[in-house]
Design a protein with these regions (language model features):
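Active-site glycine/GP-rich loop and adjacent strand/helix microenvironment
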Residues: 1-43, 51, 55-58, 183-428
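Short, glycine/acidic-rich beta->alpha junctions
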Residues: 52, 110, 139
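Short, compositionally biased "basic patch" segments
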Residues: 112-124, 180-187
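Conserved adenylate-forming
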Residues: 119-175
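Active-site diphosphate/adenylate-binding microenvironment
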Residues: 5, 47, 58-117, 125-132, ...
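Serine-centered coil/turn micro-motif
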Residues: 17, 22-23, 63-65, 173-175
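Short phosphate-engaging motifs
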Residues: 63, 67, 172, 236-237, ...
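Amphipathic alpha-helical segments that form well-ordered structural scaffolds
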Residues: 59, 66, 70, 142, ...
Length: 428
């Protein structure tokens, strides 16, 4: 299996990009690490995204006859394009299965990158998306900045400790794991993987089950580093909460003496970060997971040191997108990176819709992608609500489209991790 390159390697390879002399790409590189974007007004950012849309379409038309003809056939003039034009260009994710991405890739794209694959749990060919080193560096910096905004504080390089309740091999396969791994490398924060992958000796799928590595989990629990960041599918949070919460008095005392837990103290700035939300496989609703976890996990305000309910963040990311949407439980709904154009389509007509508090089909345009024009429909229903934050809107996740609605379901990263934990017996 192809291995995810290190962030250090990607940074060096990105310097060799053939597109660095292109004004559009140079601007993207600068914007990907611009933290001040989160302080801009919704109007300013909407104008910026429109400018990037136009320069992006121009970039692809200059570098690909395929895109030049596509824009002409759709009656789109790159120099006059509007966000409403994106609905004409949005690609359903099902078209990206197998080698579907090939027709959309620039023929002169940068080499030396990495191909991400979706989970493949639907029984169909997984979605495969190629990312150049330049794109992966931009992705890492942009996602780290978005994370810090939603987290509410700056993560000081080299400070803190993270636990990911997943096997390290999955960073070579699932986007959520790769997002986290690269971002923590960028911030120089140590990451511990708390599970092992049990391979299926008979062949077939890459894995059969995930099993907890108790020593690595205890290393995280015992550590006094701050902040402590706990990354997991919702099922993993449920697993630890249930196991520590169900201890009898004697076992609770023994565990407390040996490990200092329960409660599991995440310290100043400690946070739980889940991926993909609760998929409803065999775990409770997300509200229940949060409530039960807060009985077992403890955290402190990063400024005052006073105990606070453990903060929860959730990541909505897809194989097809460079930057994710993040939320913070009880504080904000899902919010995109300032550069990402998130728009809704009517589920029946696929026409753009601007209504608030109405179910719409999620569609995304990410201008940071320069190997293919990243405008796609992942197959999720969301609602948008007005917001006073930089984006002017926030998004509430509702559900996946069903097969009856003409969509082949593909479990997201969080749901895949959840399923693997059950296969391994970890959640029995």
């Amino acid at each position: 299996m192809e291995k995810l390159p290190t962030f250090e390697y990607l940074e060096e390879k990105a310097k060799e990009s053939r597109f660095l002399n292109d004004p559009h790409v140079r601007r993207l590189v600068e914007l990907s690490e611009d933290r001040s974007l989160f302080e801009k007004s919704p109007e300013y950012l909407a104008q910026l995204r429109r400018d990037l849309l136009r320069s992006s379409l121009d970039f692809f038309a200059r570098n690909s006859e395929f895109y030049q003809k596509l824009f002409e056939s759709q009656g789109i003039d790159p120099s006059a394009a509007e966000p409403e034009d994106l609905a004409k260009l949005a690609v359903p994710s099902d078209l990206l299965r197998g080698n579907g991405i090939e027709r959309f890739l620039l023929p002169n794209r940068d080499p030396g990158g990495f191909t991400f694959r979706s989970s493949g749990t639907s029984g169909k060919d997984p979605v495969r998306i190629y990312r150049s080193p330049l794109e992966l560096v931009a992705m890492t910096k942009a996602n780290a900045n978005l994370f810090e905004y939603v987290y509410g504080d700056y993560l000081k390089p080299g400070q803190g400790l993270a636990l990911f309740l997943a096997a390290e091999e999955l960073k070579n396969h699932l986007n959520f794991v790769a997002f986290v791994d690269l971002a923590l490398q960028y911030k120089k924060i140590k990451l511990i993987y708390g599970m092992d992958l049990a391979h299926d000796a008979s062949g077939g799928p890459l894995w059969k089950k995930l099993v907890p590595n108790k020593q690595k989990i205890l290393e995280f629990v015992r550590s006094r580093d701050e902040p402590k960041l706990f990354f997991s599918a919702p099922a993993g949070v449920h697993l630890l909460s249930e196991q520590f919460g169900s201890l009898g008095l004697v076992k609770r005392i023994i565990y407390k003496l040996a490990t200092g837990a329960p409660p599991i103290n995440l310290g100043r700035g400690g946070t739980i970060v889940t991926g993909g939300g609760s998929k409803g496989f065999q775990v409770p609703e997300y509200d229940v997971i949060v409530r039960e976890a807060r009985k077992v996990f403890r955290a402190e305000d990063p400024s005052t040191g006073k105990e606070v309910p453990v903060p929860f963040m959730d990541v909505l990311g897809m194989t097809e997108t460079l930057t994710a949407l993040l939320d913070k439980y009880g504080v904000m709904q899902k919010i995109p990176h300032p550069l990402q154009e998130v728009f809704l389509l009517d589920p029946k007509t696929y026409k753009p819709m601007d209504d608030y508090n109405k179910d719409g089909l999620l569609a995304i345009f990410d201008p940071l992608a320069v190997s293919w024009l990243e405008v796609f429909i992942p197959g999720d229903i969301v609602r948008q609500i007005p917001s006073e934050r930089y984006y002017g809107r926030e998004f509430i996740y509702v559900r996946r489209l069903t097969e009856e609605e003409g969509w082949n379901l593909q479990r997201a990263c969080g749901g895949t991790l959840e399923e693997l934990m059950y296969r391994g017996g970890a959640l029995q």
